[in-house]
Amino acid sequence: MENILQIVLISITQGVTEFIPVSSSAHVNLLSKIFGYEDIELIINVSAHFGSLIAVTFFFRREIFEFTKNKHLFFKVVIASVPIGAIGFFLIKYEIISNLRTLEMMGWTTIIFGLLLYISDKFQTKQDIENSFTVKNAIVIGCFQVLALVPGVSRSGIIITGARFLKFNRIDSAKISFLLSIPALGGWSLYGFYDLIKQNDGWLNTGAVLTAFLSFIFSYLTIKYFLVYLKKFNLSLFVGYRLILGIILLFVVYL
């Protein structure tokens, strides 16, 4: 029963927080601290991310199909994904990221990058994906995405921040974040599956399937309703939430 509860909590947390600007890693680590899940199984972690990957790919299947026909847009998505892929592989290979994954680090980054998100959201909108997602903008957003390798920053959050600084509207900023999540989550999933094979770890078990399924459902719903939310409201709610979460994380550390 405890394992089922862990699977449900991790899946929901991953699904909900992966695509909104609040840092999924901070939430998963806080969850682990609260419930004593000190060592989340690799298969659960990989399955949760894989479920999110399938959800975002399915949700944007039409856009992805259009991208494959539009070589220029497809090329720009690739360009924006190269920095995090190259640097991320190096940092993961030499376990540099794991050394940064502390509640203290995530507390501070959650607050600092939450404030950056607030500042960026004040920029006036002048650009959209159709006309302004240039090679230059793709490179800049790709460089912003590298910062997501620092635990607590939030991949979705930092891409939206970068896009808003470049004066993309909120909806398109979120869409850029979602589309760039596909190669990022795909790369992470492949690396995770490779690790599972290398460790000869048991996979494709009931727990893995349940994790991926729940993560898919909650990821899909989050993407759908986050876009609905952005049509009416700004990002202040998420900024406030990040500040509160960061304070809670630091409170846990320094208490």
Q: Residues of each region from the PLM?
A:
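Multi-pass membrane proteins that catalyze or facilitate reactions on polyprenyl-/lipid-phosphate substrates
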Residues: 1-255
